[in-house]
From Swiss-Prot:
Listed Basic and acidic residues bias regions: 29-38
Highest taxon above the source species: Bacteria
A Pfam family assignment: Ribosomal_L32p
Keyword Magnesium part of the UniProt annotation: no
Single Gene Ontology BP annotation: translation
Region (Disordered): 1-56
Gene coding for it: rpmF1
Keyword line: Ribonucleoprotein, Ribosomal protein
Organism classification: Bacteria, Bacillati, Bacillota, Bacilli, Bacillales
Protein name: Large ribosomal subunit protein bL32A
UniProt biased composition (Basic residues): 7-20
Any one Gene Ontology cellular component term annotated for this protein: large ribosomal subunit
Length: 56
């Protein structure tokens, strides 16, 4: 089996991992309540795009 010729340094390892960071969720302001919520999700009161989806 193949074995690495040299140990991978911390700098080389960290440079490879630069794209693995977390991203913030896509929040948008609700036009009816003014609260921030995730895009394309039903709001906590059960409405989506001005229509009632879930009766409370």
């Amino acid at each position: 089996m193949a074995v690495p010729a040299r140990r991978t340094s911390k700098a080389k390892k960290n440079k490879r991992r630069t794209h693995k960071g977390l991203t913030a969720p896509g929040l948008s302001r609700d036009s009816e309540t003014g609260e921030y919520r995730m895009s394309h999700r039903i709001s906590p009161d059960g409405t989506y795009k001005g229509r009632t989806i879930i009766e409370k």
